[in-house]
């Protein structure tokens, strides 16, 4: 994050750490790119190659679109403070949410077996669960979920505004701590194995 102080007002303003002009290549090995978004309504589409892990912290409701990314294996949204942000074009990546108390949106998941990791998400309060939308525009193509949860209070949904998601028929959950995972109504109707 870039922190700038306005000389006229003395106000601090943070700016996004990535934009659509960025071209990054991680090369060999396992690489992690950490992104902070600060401007609401921003849609950044960076070109990423050989970067396996993408971590995003939303300070405002914006979109990081990975349509020009290759080799991404895990997308993690963590420690966000602003309105629900969206990570689009996640393809076959594992989707992870950590230390999060605001909603998260993903889009464009093509994984048939979707790995979901939730660590210290939401709270036990009556309205403490956060919503994780697995397909804001294009529904998730997962036919099964593999969920790892630790102290997670999550409501899963798929808005699927343009393209319907696949029919999910099974889910596995490995849980530690206290958890509450609520599936989307459409998934509850079709999951046969839990």
Predicted feature locations:
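Solvent-exposed, low-complexity segments and loops of surface/extracellular structural proteins
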Residues: 1-194
